[in-house]
Every structure is written in C-alpha cells, then in structure tokens.
Amino acid sequence: MKKNIRHFLLLSALAAGSIHLLNRFIQAAADMKNILKAENGNYYDWKNGKIYYTKRGNGSPLLLIHDLDPVSSSYEWCKVIRKLEKNHTVYTLDLIGCGRSDKPFLTYTNYLYVQLITDFIRNDIGEKTAVLTSNESVSFTVLACNMNKDLMSSILVLNPASLKSLHITTNKYASVKKTLFELPIIGTFLYNLRVSNTSLNKAFREDYYARPQLISSKLMDAYYEAAHMNFSRGKYLMASMEANYTKNSIEHAVKKLEVPFYLILSRNGKDAIANADTYTRLNSSIETVYLSNCKKYPQLEVPDKVVETVNQFLQNN
C-alpha cells in the first residue's frame, strides 16, 4: 500500500513538473518576438497595479479602450491611431489584467474597470474626453459615464456586447471554473490551452474577421504575446470572466445617458441589427451606423472606414 502511494506521489510530481516546464516554454515562445514593446508608452500608477498607456497627437482628447479579453491589448487600435491622432490627442491603455499592464491575482469585477476608467480620465487626461470602446468594454464605459457626469463628452462603441449577455450573474458552477483557472500549475495549463495559437487562429477566422485572408501573422503573434505576458497571469482575468464577475446590466444606465452615444456595427456580425435595436429602444437618441466587410473588430479589418466614421461623429458633436 505504501509503495503504491509512493508511486502515485512520484508520478504526480513528475506530471506537475512536466506541465510546469511546458507552461514556461509557452511563455518563452510567446515573448520571443517582443511585438508589444513597453518602451513605446508610459505607466499610470493606479491603486491596483501599473497601467500601460500611450499618448499621441494634438487636439481634443480621445480615449481608446480595447475589448475586455485576456488576449486583447491596446494593439487592437494599431491600424487607426496614426490617423486619429491627426485631429485628436489620442490615449490608449491596456486594461488591468491585459497586455503590458499588471495582472494581479484578484477578482476582476465590472466595477473594478469603472474605477480604472474614471481614475485614468480624471488623473491623467484631466478633462472631459470622448471615448471609443469595443465589445465587452461597453458595460463599464457606460456605467462610468453614468456615475460621473463630468467624465465623458461622448461615447462611441464598436460592436457592443448584447444587453442580454451583460445581464448574466455568477453561479456555483462558474465559481468552480474560476477556482480551477486560479490554481498555480494546472490553472495556467488550462489557460494556455484556451489561448493557444490554434484557439486564436480559430477565433480570428470565425469571429474576428469576415475576410480571413487579411489576417497577418504579426497580428496573430501580438495577440498571442498579449495573452501570455507576465507568465500567463491573464488567467486571473479569464477566471473572473468565466465566473461572470465582469458582467453587469447596463440597461438602466443606457436609458439615462445624456452624452452623445454612437454605435458602430458590422453588417457581417452576428445579430448586429437586433443588437442595435435593443439599445435604441432604451434610448432613442442613440445613433447607429453599419460597416460592411468586417466582423467583431472593424478597427483591424476596415480601419479607414472606422476612422472616417469616428471623425465624422466627433466633428458633429
């Protein structure tokens, strides 16, 4: 009996060691190309960690907030920044838990991001700003604006998450998944499987782009690198997202919005028209525009159309 226990413990230790080495190899491979260079920007010392950001151009302030996803970063805006900065002082940031920002071991809640956006605009930008945001990040952007009337001059959203998807709450099963992802070795391994090159390639081809032939290897490498920076600690954000802690209903906030609110949607996206209708039914002042030949991230697939649409909206408001 004791011999069997020793064999089991030995095999368990060998398995754990092998998985740990595999995790470290994945980390090293992801960092090898160093596409996301931190020296190109600055760090905002926030209460929960250092937040990577950039500031470029001159003119009225415009803050770009990438989609809330462990694979995302401000690199999401790489194809539109140079053109937007011709007319605006453009700020980008890597949300906490993403990209080059710190990825602390904590529960990432929707309100955490409300606080981050509020503090960054007040302490670093220092004046009312227009905000261009993407997908899941619509929730905390709208809530931050609703809670602080002097924060934003206008909001533009690329393919906002559906109101129904934001109304999901956590449960026991989701909490178990959160705990699994937070485990030191096996949790990192599970996370690495979820953000593998194969998984990212599938996401880009099926969800992110309408025309897969436009996907560049450098773009894929940047997303892969973002997911694995800081020893794959993006798993803590993923753990909280799996448990729906980053979700929050925004219907009440959408109804009360007093700043110009503009939805930019992809015709090739799933349920784009129906999604827009749920927003406009709550607030008739919301404006919408549809872009063709793109899916989830038009800022990457049709950047010129996005820049033209954003500039036109900001000039009119």
Language model regions located:
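Active-site loop/oxyanion-hole signature of alpha/beta-hydrolase fold enzymes
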Residues: 92-132, 308
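Conserved loop-alpha-helix segment in the C-terminal half of the alpha/beta-hydrolase fold
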Residues: 256-294
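Conserved hydrolase catalytic core segment
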Residues: 126-170
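Catalytic active-site module of serine/aspartate enzymes centered on a nucleophile-bearing elbow/loop
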Residues: 284-317
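Conserved HGGG/HGGXW glycine-rich cap/lid loop of the alpha/beta-hydrolase fold
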Residues: 54-100
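Conserved alpha/beta-hydrolase catalytic His-Asp/Glu region
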Residues: 193-253
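A short loop-to-beta-strand scaffold at the N-terminal edge of the catalytic core in hydrolase folds
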Residues: 46-56
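Hydrophobic alpha-helical topogenic segments used for membrane insertion/localization
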Residues: 2-26
